[in-house]
Design a protein with these regions (language model features):
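Beta-propeller blade termini
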Residues: 59-68, 88, 108-117, 137, ...
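Beta-strand-rich domains and repeat architectures in extracellular enzymes and scaffolds
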Residues: 52-70, 74, 79
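Bacterial N-terminal signal peptides
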Residues: 19-30
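Glycine-aliphatic tripeptides that mark coil-to-beta-strand junctions in extracellular
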Residues: 70-72, 119-121, 168-170, 216-218, ...
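Hydrophobic beta-strand segments that make up the repeating blades of beta-propeller
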Residues: 74-77, 123-126, 172-175, 220-224, ...
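N-terminal secretory signal peptides that target proteins for export/translocation
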Residues: 1-15
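Blade-edge motifs of beta-propeller repeat domains
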Residues: 34-56, 88-105, 137-154, 185-202, ...
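Short glycine/acidic-enriched loop and turn motifs that connect beta-strands
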Residues: 80-82, 129-131, 178-180, 225-229, ...
Length: 343
């Protein structure tokens, strides 16, 4: 299996070049949005930079500086061989020989954060086939110490790290297949205590944290979709590790992947998500009180399944890249200087 690396070509600002990473799954569409037939990159914007070998069945890809050298490193969750592949970056788009770490059955999701408060990035991954999630404590050199698994309910899906009780220690929210979210409160040494559980209304593969109502407490937003119910579920945090009943927004739009980004420069985290309905991406502008303006739709490629924000051209505006699983390509939503968008 391979990860495909595209690099932006910013002729006027070469120092601001960003990499767009896509996963390639043999025989099936990739979660990262690239299929077997790689599309031609848009002229003067992207070129195919490299192909990087991973483990079997890569299902998620994470970029983070694991060894604190200022270069972006990559982590791949390999579902078919129950492992993580660590790729340490050299800073020029090239990576060192991969390192493999065995984890529990069927990792499909990755997250990062400082779990034990030593200032070094750690890794968290779910074990879909083992009803747990795994914490790997980083040493700061690209190596890790795997801790005993943290037990969860059946079929853990997304892992969403954040400080939910305001004690300065990293906590985690874990979504489950059967319409549930579990809260785990960090102790500061890499272990967790089980907190409350919440109904999500439907299955969620993607979630984020943010202070959406500006009360100083961490909130959680989930992209929750199933055959009979779908919405963005917004759980407002109480600051003690508990959450209020969720507010359902963007109902019936079948959200899949969800990110936050200030898209109109007002200092508030807006929501952007891909949808399984109509091959659309949606933008929701935050009002700062936990509510959002009506969704703005952007039509794009077939099967938008993943997205990321970044500066993909030479201006200073935030753009969005969307990976399309069915049409095996990616689309760009470019923000103009006047605040409007071009798809």
């Amino acid at each position: 299996m391979y990860a495909i690396l595209y690099q932006t070509i910013a002729k006027t600002q070469p120092a601001s070049r960003l990499a767009l990473i896509c996963l390639l799954l043999i025989g099936v569409p990739a979660l990262g949005g690239c299929g077997m037939e790689l599309p031609a990159p848009p002229p003067d914007l992207f070129h195919k930079f490299n192909s990087i070998k991973t483990g079997l069945g890569p299902a998620d890809l994470l970029s983070v500086d694991l060894n604190l050298d200022g270069h972006v490193d990559l982590v791949s969750a390999n579902t078919l061989e129950n492992s993580l592949t660590i790729l340490l970056g050299k800073g020029d788009g090239v990576f060192k020989e991969p390192r493999t770490f065995k984890v529990a059955a069927e990792p499909t999701t990755l997250a990062t954060g400082d779990v034990n408060g030593d200032g070094i990035p750690d890794l968290l991954t779910n074990a879909r086939g083992a009803e747990q999630f795994t914490v790997l404590l980083g040493y700061g050199n690209g190596s890790f110490r795997k801790l005993p698994g943290v037990r969860t309910g059946k079929v853990p899906l997304a892992i969403i790290p954040g400080d939910f009780n305001g004690d300065g220690k990293l906590d985690a929210a874990v979504t489950l297949t059967f319409d549930k979210m579990e809260i785990f409160l960090g102790t500061g040494d890499g272990t967790f205590k089980k907190g409350d559980s919440y109904s999500t209304g439907s299955r969620s593969f993607s979630g984020i944290t943010g202070d959406f109502d500006r009360d100083g407490n961490a909130d959680i937003a989930l992209a929750a979709s199933s055959s009979n119910s779908s919405a963005i579920r917004l759980f407002e945090g109480n600051g003690d590790g508990t959450f209020s009943n969720p507010l359902a927004i963007a109902k019936n739009l079948v959200p899949l992947a969800l990110i936050k980004q200030d898209m109109n420069s007002d200092g508030l985290p807006d929501l952007i998500f891909t949808s399984a309905q109509g091959d659309n991406m949606y933008l929701m502008i935050a009002r700062g009180d936990g509510t959002f303006d009506k969704e703005i739709a952007f039509a794009g490629g077939g099967g938008p399944i993943a997205l990321t924000a970044g500066h993909f051209n030479s201006d200073d505006q935030v753009d969005i890249a969307v990976a399309n699983s069915r049409s095996s390509n990616f689309s760009l939503i470019v923000r103009k200087a006047d605040g409007s968008f071009h798809y």
